[in-house]
Amino acid sequence: METFSSKDMALKAQKKILSKMATKSMVQMIIDDTSSEILDELYRVSKEYTGNRSEAQKVVKDLIKVVVKIGVLFRHNRFNEEELKLAQNFQKKLRQGAMTAISFHEVDFTFDKTVMSDILTESRDMLLKLVNTHLTTKSHGRINHVFNHYADPELLTQLYNSSGPLKPHLNKICNGLNKLLENGTL
């Protein structure tokens, strides 16, 4: 028997359309200014670290696509009880990561690349488990791409180097994360 569902088709179409529209101008219409500023700084960090503009754009675009698709899944109540619990744990892990990033930034000589990398890796694994049955292999690849990029211990070391060229970006990222934590967004 054929199992056609217009609701499923609409969801797939919406995810596809939104992922195609993951441009900077479109993102600014969907997300708040603080999140947009953080994404801009993450792009700059990636660009300076890799020396490759297109790779930096791809990482941030992958991040945006994943966030949009997960938002669509939430909006359409696609997660079961177990997945919703996992989503809450993922959100807690992100919050922990943000607070850790800020703490490492604010308190000199406390940065530990292993701790930060582990938090990002654990977050990636939780997210992959959450979307396992909902997103395509290509989207799973995007999640891996984003988290593996930002969990790179060498990138993190350069980012937290107090006299390094990435320090101004870290300042802005942490200021943005602080705002998101204070207003309850994160």
UniProtKB/Swiss-Prot annotation:
Keywords: Immunity, Innate immunity
GO biological process: innate immune response; regulation of apoptotic process
Top-rank taxon, per record: Eukaryota
Pfam families on file: DUF758 (PF05527)
Entry annotated with the keyword Lipid metabolism: no
Cellular component GO terms, alphabetical: cytoplasm
InterPro entries tied to this protein: TNFAIP8-like, TNFAIP8_sf
Keyword Iron (UniProt): no
Recorded family membership: Belongs to the TNFAIP8 family. TNFAIP8L2 subfamily.
Comment field on protein domains: The central region was initially thought to constitute a DED (death effector) domain. However, 3D-structure data reveal a previously uncharacterized fold that is different from the predicted fold of a DED (death effector) domain. It consists of a large, hydrophobic central cavity that is poised for cofactor binding.
Physiological role: Acts as a negative regulator of innate and adaptive immunity by maintaining immune homeostasis. Negative regulator of Toll-like receptor and T-cell receptor function. Prevents hyperresponsiveness of the immune system and maintains immune homeostasis. Inhibits jun/ap1 and NF-kappa-B activation. Promotes Fas-induced apoptosis.
Annotated protein name in UniProt: Tumor necrosis factor, alpha-induced protein 8-like protein 2 B
Lineage: Eukaryota, Metazoa, Chordata, Craniata, Vertebrata
Record gene name: tnfaip8l2b
